[in-house]
């Protein structure tokens, strides 16, 4: 019983996503109120009819009172509604089976908004343009766009419920230093440098290349001048890869799950996402640029082996555990794991995709820079990803700076800044005028030239300056025209619409070479990804420890032992119910820790039945010395959720803490642990400190 909707203030649907149960419930409700002989409207219109009163009342309250409701429950607590306004449009999430909390629903809405930004870039700044992208006039094109985001939302929901990396929103790495180093060298010499040296690349330049095994990062390489990818962007890329090339489950498991009667089903709006097995977690992301060849790694006490050649292609206080927590993982079921669902994914090579990620251009930060992503499948579950930039990338920086300048000007005018000499004296206004004059000089569009002349006559006239209201109107027109240029430059020319991209033979060559290099490791990698980090090596030093998740929030990387609540996938906790029970405890601990961190609590200790749960957040300097703790900001219930996909909370937290430590770099860490309840609290805290120190020291070890 789940639904997500994006609508205008007039209740026009721009996007929707429902599961089968919600759609059926809505159909039955409308059948009772409509004449049985009349044909029911399409689902889009049904949702508009259902939610129009909510949407219109919410927007009216906002207009009249400058405030509105953001969450409510229906009678008898049957349905939970969460509303979040982004720009001009209202995002609504509904849950009717009590499987998601207010925080879960709000996080889902923020992730959806982030996915819109990744796909449309700065076009999302303009309400009219993003409306045309999300709701094209052509019905077939609209269905294609909606299906794409429905599938992405379904994939995200699945990964969030199954993958520890998506639960805590941090990148996990497959830990094998030897293979990691070999793979990085191959990416550097035979992929990135080889493609960039080819005269046939058509102006495209490979910036980043990385290897994924399921959701784990095996190796990552960045070329000359490439910016560091944010953890949120890397997680988004992993999500896109899992959507394009979903990791297959076993046929037996799919049959068993199809026959189950689990109440929680994945919505059929994303039917082409096959089953994925639970996967284990890892540690720091290995990266190496052409400027710096050292690769970060974690050296954990594990045994590694080189596989024999493949025989061939066949080869703070006591708290009460909240009711209604995360259900056991074995209750999760994929409704689309059917032959029809599996067949809907074509085995052909995915086409290049235009995406927008944060980057630095000419040493200037620029959000939502256009890139082209190439997902090159090596084997089921193993993929190579390339990210390229085009020669027109510098235009993105210019457009962002102009849009940012006009947005700041709008803010000043709305705050009561009068037009005239006071406005002209603002330093950013002179800089904006200079950049815009230079930009207009190199553009041939008559419309934007005329609008700019109109703006200058109103903003910089000493005799008859325009009013603030007039300047706001012209500012809005200029921003829209800049967004139109952005759209024509980067969306209309996207590879999926016939725009420039790497020649197919260069992609094929890189794909073939990487397959040859990894052929002898293929089976090992697939097994290793399921059992990446084990608890065995920790039990002797940390008796009573059941599970942990360690996160370096500065780099957005994490390490955790594997959790496999799957009947077919054995783990140290055995099969089925026990592993599922522990997983449910861990997921509930993650949610509870976020809730208390939102209220300013950085330490959490409590007992629930046979387990003691703990959560710690702390800061260190680059030498690994713990820094004095401060009070972290308290956030409202309707604020952007804690995490990195929906909003970069930890980057803001680091910036906030660094104000009190301006002379040294600051790092942020989190540790979540699950112990047996026989372990005393003081010993638990001691173990947590020792575990954090051990993992922290390992994370600073580099490969030879």
Swiss-Prot record:
Cellular component (GO) terms are: BLOC-3 complex; cytoplasm; cytoplasmic vesicle
Give me the stretches of Acidic residues compositional bias.
251-261
GO-annotated molecular function: guanyl-nucleotide exchange factor activity
Q: What is the effect of changing residue 567 to K?
A: In strain: BALB/c
> Could you tell me in which tissues this protein is expressed?
Expressed in all tissues examined with the possible exception of skeletal muscle. The highest expression was observed in lung, liver, kidney and spleen.
Known outcome of mutating residue 31 to R: In strain: BALB/c
Q: Where are the [DE]-X(4)-L-L repeats?
A: 45-51, 520-526, 648-654
Please name one Pfam family that this protein belongs to: Fuz_longin_3
The record's annotation in InterPro entries points to: FUZ/MON1/HPS1_longin_1 (IPR043972), FUZ/MON1/HPS1_longin_2 (IPR043971), FUZ/MON1/HPS1_longin_3 (IPR043970), HPS1 (IPR026053)
Pathology noted in the record is: Defects in Hps1 are the cause of the pale ear (ep) mutant which exhibits hypopigmentation associated with defects of multiple cytoplasmic organelles, including melanosomes, lysosomes, and granular elements of platelets.
Could you describe the subunit structure of this protein? Component of the biogenesis of lysosome-related organelles complex-3 (or BLOC-3), a heterodimer of HPS1 and HPS4. HPS1 cannot but BLOC-3 complex (heterodimer of HPS1 and HPS4) can interact with the GTP-bound form of RAB9A and RAB9B. HPS1 and BLOC-3 complex do not interact with the GDP-bound form of RAB9A and RAB9B.
Role played: Component of the BLOC-3 complex, a complex that acts as a guanine exchange factor (GEF) for RAB32 and RAB38, promotes the exchange of GDP to GTP, converting them from an inactive GDP-bound form into an active GTP-bound form. The BLOC-3 complex plays an important role in the control of melanin production and melanosome biogenesis and promotes the membrane localization of RAB32 and RAB38.
Which protein is depicted?
BLOC-3 complex member HPS1
Species this protein is from: Mus musculus (Mouse)
């Amino acid at each position: 019983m789940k639904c997500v909707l994006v609508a205008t203030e007039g209740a026009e649907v721009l996007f929707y996503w429902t599961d089968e149960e919600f759609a059926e419930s809505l159909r039955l409700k409308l059948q009772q109120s409509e004449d049985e002989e009349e044909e029911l409207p399409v689902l889009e219109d049904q949702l508009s009819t259902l939610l129009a009163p909510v949407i219109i009342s919410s927007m009216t309250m906002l207009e009249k009172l400058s405030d509105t409701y953001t969450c409510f429950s229906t009678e008898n607590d049957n349905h939970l509604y969460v509303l979040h306004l982004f720009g001009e449009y209202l995002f609504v999430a509904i849950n009717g089976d009590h499987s998601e909390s207010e925080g879960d629903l709000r996080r889902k809405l923020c992730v959806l908004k982030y996915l819109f930004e990744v796909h449309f870039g700065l076009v999302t700044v303009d309400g009219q343009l993003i409306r045309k992208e999300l709701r094209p006039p052509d019905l077939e094109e609209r269905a294609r766009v909606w299906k794409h985001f429905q599938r992405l939302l379904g994939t995200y929901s699945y990964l969030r419920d199954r993958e520890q990396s998506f639960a805590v929103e941090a990148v996990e790495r497959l830990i094998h230093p030897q293979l990691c180093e070999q793979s990085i060298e191959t990416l550097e010499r035979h992929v990135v440098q080889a493609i960039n040296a080819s005269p046939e690349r058509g102006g495209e330049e490979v910036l980043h290349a990385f290897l994924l095994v399921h959701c784990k990062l095996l190796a990552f390489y960045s070329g000359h001048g490439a910016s560091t990818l944010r953890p949120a962007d890397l997680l988004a890329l992993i999500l896109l890869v899992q959507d394009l090339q979903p990791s297959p489950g076993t046929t037996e498991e799919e049959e068993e799950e199809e026959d189950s009667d689990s109440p929680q089903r994945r919505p059929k709006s994303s039917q082409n996402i096959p089953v994925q097995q639970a996967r284990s977690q890892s540690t720091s992301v290995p990266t190496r640029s052409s400027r710096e060849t050292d690769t970060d790694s974690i050296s954990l006490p594990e045994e590694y082996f080189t596989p024999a050649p493949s025989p061939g292609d066949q080869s703070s206080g006591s708290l009460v555990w909240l009711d209604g927590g995360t259900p056991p993982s074995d209750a999760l079921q994929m409704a689309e794991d059917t032959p029809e669902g599996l067949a809907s994914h074509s085995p052909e090579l995915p086409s290049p995709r235009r995406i927008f990620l944060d980057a630095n251009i000419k040493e200037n930060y620029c959000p939502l820079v256009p890139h082209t992503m190439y997902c090159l499948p090596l084997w089921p579950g193993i993929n190579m990803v390339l990210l390229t930039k085009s020669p027109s990338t510098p235009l993105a920086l210019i457009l962002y700076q102009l849009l940012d300048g006009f947005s700041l000007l709008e803010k000043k005018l709305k705050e009561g800044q009068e037009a005239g000499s006071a406005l002209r004296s603002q330093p950013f206004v002179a800089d904006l005028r200079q950049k815009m004059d230079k930009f207009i000089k190199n553009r041939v569009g008559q419309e934007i030239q005329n609008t700019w002349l109109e703006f200058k006559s109103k903003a910089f006239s000493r005799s008859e300056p325009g009013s603030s209201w007039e300047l706001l109107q012209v500012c809005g027109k200029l921003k829209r025209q800049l967004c139109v240029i952005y759209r024509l430059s980067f969306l209309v020319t996207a590879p999926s619409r016939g725009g420039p991209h790497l020649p197919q033979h260069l992609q094929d060559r890189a794909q073939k070479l990487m397959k040859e290099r990894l052929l002898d490791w293929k089976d090992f990698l697939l097994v290793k990804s399921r059992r990446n980090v084990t608890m065995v090596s920790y039990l002797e030093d940390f008796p009573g420890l059941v599970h942990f998740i360690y996160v370096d929030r500065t780099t957005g990387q994490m390490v955790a032992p594997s959790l496999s609540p799957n009947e077919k996938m054995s783990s140290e906790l055995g099969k089925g119910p026990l592993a599922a029970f522990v997983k449910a405890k861990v997921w509930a601990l993650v949610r509870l820790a976020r809730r208390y961190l939102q209220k300013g609590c950085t330490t959490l200790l409590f007992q629930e039945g046979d387990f003691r749960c703990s959560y710690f957040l702390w800061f260190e300097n680059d030498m690994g010395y713990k820094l004095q703790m401060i009070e972290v900001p308290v956030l409202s219930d309707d604020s952007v959720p804690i995490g990195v996909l929906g909003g970069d909370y930890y980057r803001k937290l680091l910036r906030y803490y660094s104000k009190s430590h301006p002379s040294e770099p600051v790092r942020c860490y989190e540790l979540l642990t699950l112990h047996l309840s026989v372990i005393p609290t003081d010993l638990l805290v001691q173990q947590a400190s020792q575990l954090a120190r051990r993992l922290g020291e390992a994370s600073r070890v580099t490969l030879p």
